[in-house]
Amino acid sequence: MAKVLVLYYSSWGHVEQMANAVAEGAREAGAEVAVKRVPELVPEEVARQFHYKLDQAAPIATVEELADYDAIIFGTPTRYGNMASQMKQFIDQTGGLWAKGALVGKVGSAFTSTASQHGGQETTLTSFHTVMFHHGMVVVGLPYSFAGQNGVEQVKGNSPYGATTIADGDGSRQPSQVELDGARFQGRHVAGIAAKLAG
């Protein structure tokens, strides 16, 4: 049984919803799944002023525990086409893991949210891919065998680089069914590959 970590940062809960959907998919594939988040860096009074979702149930991860999993699926909202600083700050502490080759051969994947359809989804996902390559991870996206990412009949996220959702500039749009389905598919897909690699 593959061990999968869904590690995310979420300001307003969109990525949290996607993380839970990713975890559902990985569990459906038979994986042992943990959902954890990285620490918030925004001062609490500022976070409250901007209505951040501060009641997220997922526990805070430690850098060292990343080595305990067969696959890590990262999630973050985009910040100007890149991962959020909270996630970057966490990842920047993985030098010790890199020095030991602790993540080499593990499966890595990512998902994100943006304010608009063209708000930097794919560049955010590829910012994770660069990190994964440096750690020697096996990078997995969201293949076109997930049919929900095809078509133009509705505004929707998802990309071959990973599952995505569109939140609108004020955060009013919640992840749609097809976006959550994409996240579940990605979780199943990653867990299946991790199980094969773990032997």
Curated annotation (Swiss-Prot):
EC number(s) stated in the UniProt entry for this protein: 1.6.5.2
Can the keyword Flavoprotein be found in this entry's annotation?
A: yes
Q: Tell whether Nuclease is among the UniProt keywords.
A: no
Query: Which keywords does UniProt give here?
Result: Flavoprotein, FMN, NAD, NADP, Nucleotide-binding, Oxidoreductase
Q: Where does NAD(+) bind?
A: 12
Cofactor, free-text remark: Binds 1 FMN per monomer.
What protein family does this chain belong to?
A: Belongs to the WrbA family.
The record's NCBIfam families line, in alphabetical order, gives:
flav_wrbA (TIGR01755), PRK03767.1 (NF002999)
Tell me what this protein is called: NAD(P)H dehydrogenase (quinone)
Query: What is the organism field in this record?
Result: Methylorubrum populi (strain ATCC BAA-705 / NCIMB 13946 / BJ001)
